[in-house]
């Protein structure tokens, strides 16, 4: 059975944010969540909902496959 790695997701969320040159505060505002929620995600303490995951993909211009670790290739736009 597949076991999901919340910490890896958090690392990818942080990596994508940094690649876009965004502070945590800027990213939280762009995604529409509180700074504490973004911190929880990046630390692997919580996982985003499917809707929030899509917002992250659009804000950071990455694919859900990449964020979730399904595909490790270069980042792609969500939905492509």
Model-predicted regions and their roles:
Residues 18, 29, 58:
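Alpha-helical residues within the helix-turn-helix
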Residues 51-66:
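DNA major-groove recognition helix of helix-turn-helix/homeodomain DNA-binding modules
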Residues 1-2, 58, 68-80:
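Short, charged recognition helix plus adjacent turn
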Residues 18, 32, 43-45, 72:
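Residue-level detection of the helix-turn-helix DNA-binding "recognition helix"
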Residues 21-40:
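Short alpha-helical DNA-recognition segment
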Residues 1-19:
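A short, Lys/Arg-rich alpha-helix, primarily the initiator
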């Amino acid at each position: 059975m597949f076991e999901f790695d919340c910490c890896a997701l958090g690392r990818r969320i942080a990596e994508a944010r940094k690649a876009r040159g965004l502070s945590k505060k800027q990213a939280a505002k762009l995604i529409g969540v509180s700074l504490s929620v973004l911190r929880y995600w990046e630390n692997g303490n919580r996982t985003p909902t499917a809707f929030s995951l899509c917002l992250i993909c659009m804000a950071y211009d990455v694919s859900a496959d990449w964020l979730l670790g399904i595909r490790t290739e270069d980042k792609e736009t969500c939905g492509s």
